[in-house]
Amino acid sequence: MSRGLGDVYKRQIQSNMFTNIITYVWWDSNSTCYLYHNKIKRRRITMGRKIFISYKYWDDDVYPVPRFSDYHPKVRDYVSWLEDKFQNRTEHYYKGESDNEDLSMYSENYIWDKLKDKMYDSSLTIILISPNMKEPNKWEKSQWIPWELSYSIRKTTRAYYTSQRNAVLAVVLPDKHGNYNYYKSMRLFSILQANIVNGYIPVVSWNDFKYNCDKYIDKAYEAQKNTPEYKLQINI
């Protein structure tokens, strides 16, 4: 039985005729799973999230990532580290593009359609903040990250299913000297800054996040739940 995005889905998985206990599995709209039966209170289980990552691929003013950076470190190395962690050491699912997935030969419209497909099938967007993520001489509407954030926090309906707004977490990466001081004076994209200020997007340093991903992922979902919809800035 399939489950549409944004739906609540419950399924009976076990029934014991001798004890009259019926066990159910329950997913909510954020893909959080619960197990419960009719004799005890339901119990929450940590389940994998579908995660999209928004970042500036070629920003090279970042600290090297062990095992993933060569002589020319770049932000993509952090994405590869997270992709490896999610796939091999957690229950989370990485929904972004792989490093060997070259879309440069395609039109921007085609690339945007592919990105929207990935974001539609996700429930959390992680934005990697790096020193040069924002190009100073280009309009914000001409850069990918604001569009990815805007799409992530919209409710989007396709056919019979509606994808709810993603939770969003901003992770500040260390610069090439291993410092985070640049973030204090950095001019962020307007849509990102506004949704940090209104409480929708928690911010964490890479050093804290990499050792306790689930803690900060949960914080993003809490912020999503606790921030009134009217406070969100959705447009770029």
Question: Where are the language model's segments positioned?
Answer:
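Short, flexible/disordered intra-domain loops and linkers
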Residues: D60-P73, E135-I145, N181-Y183
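Conserved TIR/SEFIR loop-to-helix hotspot centered on a Trp-containing motif
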Residues: N132-R158
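Conserved acidic residues
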Residues: G6, S123, S130
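C-terminal interaction surface of TIR/SEFIR-family domains
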Residues: T23-Y24, R49-K50, Y57-Y63, V172-I236
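Alpha-helix termini
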Residues: R89-E91, K155-Q164
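Short beta-alpha junction loops
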Residues: P131-N132, T162-N179
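Conserved N-terminal substructure of TIR/SEFIR domains
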Residues: S15-L124, Y221, K225-I236
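Single conserved hydrophobic/aromatic residue that forms the stacking wall/gate
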Residues: M1-Q12
